[in-house]
Amino acid sequence: MKEYVAGMTWGEGPRWQRGALWLSDTQGGKLWTDHDGPWRGIPLDAVPNGLWFLPDGRLVGAMMHQRRIGVWTGEQFDTYADLSAVATGPLGDMVGDPHGNLYVDDVGFAAHAGEPLRPGRLLRVAADGAVHVAAEDVEFPNGLAFVGDGRTLVVAETTRQRLTAFTVADDGALTDRRTYADLAHLIGDDVRPDGIWSTQDGVWVATTTGHAVALVRENELVTSIDTGTLLPIACCSDGGNRLFVTLADTHGLPLGEAMATKAVHTTVALLEVPKAGDTS
């Protein structure tokens, strides 16, 4: 594991597109990228959480507090879809399919503001901008990824310490809810899954307080990479054998205190992993 870039407060939603890395600093208020130049942070008035690239190559972000999907103009995120009439809490991570459907976390409560836990939901934004409730009673929904042939959607339920799977119907609806991986059982009680990324070898999971990046298959732990004192937040691959992982350093403080005082700092680490074809 080696450092790739640094400078962020809390790095979420890393995505690799056309030779460049993109990620959102949800606590630092910036969009970070090395697209068209050196690694830099672009200050934003409204910051996204999850990021994704549409089939036409446009970058979209889940604007966590404004409860909308924004499309990147090069300077700001203009509204792509308004979710404010449907969302019950801040927006979280996001993933899309080849048809232009987006699935996004409706977290249900503002964890960083100290609000009490409430069940969240998954929302589906169709290619025409229509918003649908795809799943109810998802507890602290976080990372999202398609696995296999794209007909299974996996979500990290942070406080339930597990990955939950749904079958994706032809119309985009989510059915057949089931446990994909019980991470507390497979890895340990300290696991709080955040971002995930899917490859042919399984699903990579950033476990935050579990201090590990783990590769799991359905009900199986394949491997786990210890991150020492650092907390892995999210991850993505470049489609080859490189896995990018955002790692938070709380400098010995409890995570909540470090977040509240902005004492946390994030780097991106680069892991060399066996090459596999991505299905995220």
Name every feature range the model reports, one short phrase each.
Residues 161-162, 166, 182-220:
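Loop/turn-rich, solvent-exposed surfaces of beta-rich toroidal or solenoidal domains
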Residues 30-32, 68-70, 120-123, 162-164, ...:
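A short loop-to-beta-strand structural motif that recurs across blades of beta-propeller domains
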Residues 4-19, 44-63, 68, 85-102, ...:
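Beta-rich, blade/repeat-based domains predominating
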Residues 26-27, 64-65, 109-120, 158-161, ...:
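Short, solvent-exposed loop/turn segments at conserved positions within beta-propeller repeat blades
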Residues 34-39, 55, 59, 72-75, ...:
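Flexible "stalk/tail and boundary" regions
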Residues 166-173, 273-277:
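Short loop/turn segments immediately following beta-strands, especially the blade-tip
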Residues 236-280:
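Blade-level signature of beta-propeller repeat domains, shared across WD40, Kelch, NHL, RCC1
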Residues 1-5, 37-43, 78-84, 130-136, ...:
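A short beta-strand motif characteristic of beta-propeller blades
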